[in-house]
Every structure is written in C-alpha cells, then in structure tokens.
C-alpha cells in the first residue's frame, strides 16, 4: 500500500473513533462507527491473498450486522424519548439492542467467533490495530450508557468471555490466535467491572492496549507467528525473545507484572460491591489464561520444538529500526504493579 493512501486510510480510522468518542448525537456516533469500519477493511487486506480477503469479509459481515442492531436500538430509543442525544436515559429494549451490538463489535462471547479467525487471516500489524485501537470506540459508548445496561445481559457475557478466552487458547500454536483469545478474555474482565466502576474499565483498557501493542511490536520485530518460530528466535534475538515471554506472562496476569494490576483491582472492586461468586469465578477462569501462557513460555524457553531446519543461526536479520517507542512500552507493560497505590483513587 502506497504511503499517501495508507495515511488517508489511517486518518479515517482515527477520525471515526474520535467522532464516536466525542459526539453527543446518536447519528454522528453511528457515522463514526461506519467510517471506522469501512476504513479498516483495506488495512486488513493489506496483504492481498485469499486468507486476508476471507478475514476482511468475515469482519465486514459481523460489523455490518452489529451496526444494523445499533441503529435499531437508536431508532427505538428515538421513538421512545423523541431525541437523538447520547445519554444514560435509554429505553430498556434499546439498551439491550445497543449492548448486543457493541458486544458483537468488541468480540464478547457468544459473539466472539470472528475474532480468532479474522486475526489469524491478517498480518501482524493489522492484527495489532484490530485488537487495540478497534476496541476503544465500542467501549467508550458502553461507558456512556453503563447506568442503563441490563446486568443480566452483560455479566453472563463477561463470564463466558473470560471462560472461552482461556479455554480457546489452550490448544493453539498460532501466536495471533493466542492473542485473539487473550483479547476475548480481557474484554470479559472489562465487561465485568463496567457496571460497578466504569472508570476502572478504562484503566484496564489502557493497560491491555499497552501490553498487546508491545507484544505485537516485538512479534513483528522477531517475525514470529507460531510457537515454533518463536522458539527458534533464541539464537537470532535472545533479548527480544525473553521480553516477549515476560510480556506474555504479564498478559496472563502473573504477579508482580503489570497484567496483574487490573485483575487485582477488579476483584477488589467487585468484592467491595458485595459480589462473591463473580470475582471467584473470574479468578479461577483467569488461571486458564495463565496456564497456556506459562506453557508457551516453558516450551519456548526450556525446550526446542522439532524442526527440519538444522541451521542454528538465521542468516538474514530483520531491520531493527522503528524501535524508539519499545523501551518505555516494555517498562509500562511489565513494571507497573508498584504504581498501583497511586491509581487506587479510582476506588
């Protein structure tokens, strides 16, 4: 893709998200979602091959269905209230339709089926955008309508997402699918806390985006897409490989890494709201995520997968440019736990 075209498309993607976040009119919000969806599809098809086309088609069909449900919810709310203003005073039926539509856009279970398939079919850079930037707009609308969301709809979605996010990643060898299932689980954690402390949901989102962004950037630097290719990068770039493994443990929520911070704070907040079963279930299902990350770390760090390639050193090295943002991102993604008392004001 030529740089001027890429800049125009990325500007449209960013503009769509900003319009969704800043508009107070439901029609403008819907237009922002459409701008964002139509602009991201050429980015997903950047590598023009059948798998990318299939992934883009799946993404388009899912997002178009979600947009249709969102518009239905907007129209029902308009008929009930007579206004287009984005507010937390929604008709119950409109709230259910909007929550379902935004759950489809986010990839919350049971609408999660498109996330692993689409992520696997596109390039690492496109997957990075899909699993980070594309989560901001739907979550910002959920944040705005959180007082009217039906907990009997959202909390089962949250529990199912955390469960499927851990279960689905157990037998995966493709790194992009592992990141996709991790994304589903993290969205479940955010949905669980949304009804009780929406601000903490945004804190969780920031930490998740930072960790996922850093992990994908290191994957691109290492050209790693499978567990086999990751295990073969020790001779090529041992420092980057060890950083990837540390980040994966952070994504799994292993203390004392940064990924433990949002889980700790969410469980604490749910307990303060006299929820016992939900945080217990979330903590137990989070072990599934941690298990497959630790298994991947063990397999990569302490064993070597069978390979037909007998070369220990890859003769061709990737370019090491564009790493200026990596050091601060790596520090934030792994060492933020000591700063937790500073952000406890959100409680």
From Swiss-Prot:
Reaction(s) the record says it catalyses: a ubiquinone + NADH + 5 H(+)(in) = a ubiquinol + NAD(+) + 4 H(+)(out)
Pfam families, A to Z: NADH_dehy_S2_C, Proton_antipo_M
Annotated membrane topology: Multi-pass membrane protein
Quaternary structure note: Core subunit of respiratory chain NADH dehydrogenase (Complex I) which is composed of 45 different subunits. Interacts with TMEM242.
Protein location: Mitochondrion inner membrane
The keyword NAD is annotated on this UniProt entry: yes
Record-stated family: Belongs to the complex I subunit 2 family.
TM spans (from-to): 3-23, 25-45, 59-79, 96-116, 122-142, 149-169, 178-198, 201-221, 237-257, 274-294, 323-343
EC code: 7.1.1.2
UniProt name for this protein: NADH-ubiquinone oxidoreductase chain 2
